[in-house]
Design a protein with these regions (language model features):
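Nucleotide/phosphate-binding catalytic cleft detector across ATP-hydrolyzing
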Residues: 1-23, 28-151, 208, 231, ...
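N-terminal phosphate-binding loop and adjacent alpha-helix
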Residues: 1-16, 185-189, 303-311
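Gly/Thr-rich phosphate-binding beta-strand-loop-beta motif of the actin/hexokinase/Hsp70
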Residues: 24-30, 144-173, 188
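Residue-level signature of catalytic and energy-coupling elements of molecular machines
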Residues: 26, 120, 155, 188, ...
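Glycine-rich phosphate-binding loops at beta-strand->alpha-helix junctions
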Residues: 28-29, 207-209, 261-284
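Conserved phosphate-binding/catalytic loops in two-lobed NTP-binding clefts
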Residues: 52-56, 284-317
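A polyampholytic, Gly/Pro-enriched intrinsically disordered region
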Residues: 73-75, 151-155, 200, 308-331
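Phosphate-binding glycine-rich/basic clefts of nucleotide- and phosphate-handling proteins
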Residues: 105, 110-118, 134-135, 166-242, ...
């Protein structure tokens, strides 16, 4: 099903854009990822100055850390400890007898990652790069001052809620809660209501917080022409699940940072559109500074109403789009008899130094084998394309130019119509 779904998406996009799609960028997120801290220590026999090689050895040792059934997608350096002193930057040149490196490893289930890549391979879709979605999202919706001063980015999705904690420009914690706005819909549907009607009621009437004085005990919401639900019961259902999600978010904020989040909490995602969501977060987290990121910081021009709605639902997709630095489009698709097949190099994927680097940055997922394969394929495609175009140009130069056969037929027909000898 996944393979078929991927193929259908590509076909629909190509039909809409009238352009071949040669490569794609992929965002990796959801319940499959988690951030886990790890510490590596190097004891020195005598006091010595820290070298870059020592730093690299700590990082390599961390990368080599084995987790049961999981693999490291990316590693964030949290801090270094030189004897008893903590340092944010690599302490090269500092004398010590004990060097410690603290890291946040972002993990995913190894089998899930393998199956995901296999689905793309079976669908014949080339992956140009993979990004960890929460990190890409953070780069697109958070300000520098929020990351520096400390903040919690909360992505309220349909099935999951992702919490990313930043402080001093460093990701400190990454967690995914298996609860989202779809759970609210399911709770409403549990009252013998169709899923579609439950979703409609949620979008129209749901509020993350309703003051007791605003609840009208005599008011009912229409489910359909014959059925109604009491406002008070509806409010209780929505607020109970919303509060559960928010309290789970609060529990994931480490005590050491609870008083240091100068940037407050930033909400995004489709669930952030619920009425009074900011008020509910202030009430249950006791953090006063709350804002909602409805759109990415990048300037994006589009005629698509979903993009222009700027309601937070597409922030992650647009964030991954902003990360891409290569064109994924291939040749144009001919839509009529008179449109020839155009040869273009704009969709050619030529790996840059950044794309083929052995180290992942800004949430880019490390996959050396895939990078080498992409680079080799791109070079082969480049050489093949150049040869074909060169051969085609030579053939065209050698052949005398002749009118198109269909054009000749039109000329003959036109002469018959306009001939003065015609009876």
């Amino acid at each position: 099903k996944t393979v078929q779904a991927l193929s259908n998406i590509i076909k629909k996009l190509e039909a809409t854009l009238k352009t071949r799609i040669t490569h794609v960028y992929v965002g990796f997120g959801g319940q499959s990822i988690i951030g886990v801290k790890n510490t590596n220590v190097r004891e020195l026999s005598t006091e010595s100055e820290v070298t870059q090689d020592m730093i690299n050895e700590l990082m390599d040792a961390n990368r080599s850390m084995q987790y049961p059934d999981q693999q490291i997608l990316d590693a964030v350096t949290l801090e270094y400890k030189v004897d008893n002193q903590y340092q944010a930057e690599p302490p090269v040149g500092v004398p010590c007898k004990r060097l410690e490196g603290n890291f946040l490893n972002i993990l995913c289930r190894r089998e899930f990652y393998r199956r995901l890549k296999k689905c793309f391979d079976q669908a014949n879709i080339s992956i140009l790069d993979m990004y960890i979605s929460p990190l890409a999202l953070a780069d697109s919706v958070l300000t520098d001052s929020e990351k520096r001063g400390g903040c919690a980015l909360v992505d309220l999705g349909a099935d999951t809620t992702t919490v990313s904690i930043f402080h001093r420009n460093i990701l400190r914690k990454l967690s995914v809660i298996p609860l989202g706005s779809a759970n609210i819909t399911k709770d409403i549907a549990s009252l013998q209501i169709e899923d579609g009607d439950a979703e409609r009621l949620k979008l129209k009437y749901a509020s993350a917080f309703t003051d007791g004085n605003d609840i009208d005990q005599a008011r009912h919401y229409a489910i359909d022409s014959d059925r109604f639900i009491e406002m008070s019961k509806f409010v209780d259902i929505v607020e109970a699940r919303t509060r559960e999600i928010i309290e789970n978010v609060k529990s994931l904020i480490p005590d050491e940072y609870s008083e240091k989040l100068l940037g407050g909490i930033i909400l995004t995602g489709g669930g952030s559109n619920m009425n009074n969501i900011e008020r509910a977060f202030r009430l249950y987290t006791h953090i006063e500074k709350i804002r909602t990121a409805k759109f990415v910081n990048d300037t994006i021009k589009s005629t698509n109403p979903l993009v222009n709605a700027k309601d937070g639902r597409l922030c992650t997709v647009l964030a991954i789009l902003a990360k891409g630095d290569q064109n994924c489009a291939g040749s144009d698709i001919a839509s009529s008899l008179f449109e020839g097949i155009q040869t273009t190099q704009q969709g050619q994927a030529t790996p840059t130094a950044q794309a083929t680097s052995a180290k992942a940055t800004n949430g880019r997922i490390i996959d050396d084998a895939a990078k080498e394969k992409t680079q080799d394929n791109a070079k082969a495609d480049d050489n093949g394309r150049v040869k074909v175009e060169s051969s085609t140009r030579n053939e065209q130069n050698d052949k005398p130019k002749q009118p198109h056969k269909l054009l000749n037929k039109f000329k003959v027909l036109f002469r018959k119509i306009t001939s003065p000898d015609e009876e």
